[in-house]
Amino acid sequence: MALSADSFISALKAQTPVLKKKNKSLIVIHFGGGYPAIDFWEDKNGAPTMGETKAAKTAADGVRINELLPKIGSQMKNAAIIRTLKSTEGDHMRGTKVMMTGLPINVLVEQPHVGSKVAWYYRENEGDLPAFISVGGGGGVGPGFLGQRYGALPISRPGSPPENATPPKEIGGATREGTDRMMRRGDLFSRLEAGFQKSTGSERDAAKSHQEVYDKALSLVVSKNKDVFALDKDVDGKPIKLMQEYAVGGDFGRGCLLARKLTEAGAACVEVNNGGWDMHANIFASLRTRLPAVDAGIGTLLKDLAERGRLQDTVVVTLSEFGRTIRVNPGGGRDHNPGLWSVMVAGGNIVGGQVYGKTSSDATSIEENPVTTGDLFATIYAALGFEKDAQIRDSLGRPSPLAGEKAKPIAQLLKTA
């Protein structure tokens, strides 16, 4: 017997309880192209390697970052800089895979995006919002062996609704009738799918995964949380207090706002993409143009999270496929450099107001505390409060720590219990 639309909706909602408040969320600021980390986070004023970049004091004693990032600087008591990151890949595609998964490339196993891993870790507490959402494009790294259930929902432009999240106008569109007809079709599809799985003995394979993805999509169609993708009001229905400050950052700033709203509404991970950082020439003119938007987006995000009491529940990290060369090339740009670069991390269990790692006087070499990609990701997972020995099984059935066998979280950056 077919379910009514109301009972089918109830069945879907029963499968997707509201996210528990104890879960922390992750916001990944993804700078596509290989961002010039030295020009963001280094402080070696006067060194020829700094070019035209000048570092300025921040709200955190002893921490200096680019003078074009004053809003981020005002929030540095809540953020930390890792200045001695060493990754392994200087090719865009390979570097993106390493830095979005936290693991070396393995030709036998397609590793999942960090957002997919976070979604998987919180799988018992899924809500009706997608657990992993990517705003403004993506880096091309998918859910890997975890499957599409843990893939990112793409949002091409902040403020736009997800594609196909409203019933087609041919069956009534965004009306009660449209929702009822959509759910009846969903009920029919589910029964056909269940029959197919039973007849082929495929309950545990791709057919079941396909059914899960379809059910998640339908749950979004009927979700009251769907309005959270709009930027005309806040999660609580009130005007957005810092809207104008975010808007200075254009689409990137609005993407940071959307990430805050989505994580507050229950998303496990939101990736905000900001591309075009492959600056082999004329880098300093480009930085003067682009850094104000970056500052508005990230600086306002950190301020907003702190003011709303959400920073302890939200980890923010800046990632890219690699950094850029310390020395400026003859064209006035910087080339690919995975060997020494920096990231910012804030929120969750992170102790802000500090720099980890020491570079030489001209920033060309590491003097203290090198950090591997695995160490960085182990620190991210620890900042989220993941169990220290949390493991995941790959497509070959092999268990391994989320950040790899040799990875160790950076104790200095983490709050003690």
Model-predicted segments: where are they?
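Ligand-binding pockets and gating/stacking loops
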Residues: M1-A417
